[in-house]
Amino acid sequence: MSELTEKKIGRELIYDGAVLRVVKDEVELPNGKSSVREFCMHIGAVAVIPVLPDGRVLMERQYRYPHGRVFFEIPAGKLDFSGEDPLSAAKRELREETGGVAKSYTFLGELDTTPAITDEKIRMYLAEDITFCDRELDEDEFINLEFVPLSELYRMVMAGEIKDAKTQIAVLKVWQIREKYRNM
């Protein structure tokens, strides 16, 4: 198998915003030639799939400006600062967006969202044993909440009705976990 690693030669900062940075790196390719890689640097994010004892999942409907439409997705958000504990961020996002406070969190894995254009990683958690209180949405957040049976979400993912990748993966992982225990 041939070597695939590219070596960074230099970096130019193109844009430095509140949520992401855009950089242009000059790299040395495995064959010794050079090329340019442009990508977004992201602080990282978390996603939480909150599942109630009866199998319903608390979902969000939220307008996503880059796509110009409302998405149906699980609660999620970016880390507030570099080095923030992802589980703490997941707890914060669940509380702020849904008013949910869970006693149990299970790490479901890490997702590299779009590796060709960003280094963003989303750490995903299953939240269970949840109590609810008032939400604490940011002033620029507008989110509608909806409880949906996990079986219906699974059907929606398989039918292509849920377009959000983190939600698809979280639903499939939780479905697989539940199926494993059902068949024991």
Task: Tell where the protein language model's regions lie, with residue ranges.
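Unchanged
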Residues: S35, G44-A47, K78-A165
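Conserved Nudix-box catalytic region and its N-terminal flanking loop in Nudix hydrolases
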Residues: E3-T5, A47-R92
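Acidic, metal-coordinating catalytic segment for phosphate/diphosphate chemistry
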Residues: G10-A47, P53
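C-terminal boundary of histidine-terminating zinc-finger modules
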Residues: V171
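Short loop segments at secondary-structure junctions
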Residues: N31, L52-R56, Y63, E128-F132, ...
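Hydrophobic residues on conserved beta-strands that form the core of alpha/beta folds
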Residues: V22-K24, V36, E60, I74, ...
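A short, amphipathic edge element
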Residues: S2-E12
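Short beta-strand micro-motifs in enzyme catalytic cores
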Residues: R21-D25, V70, K121-R123
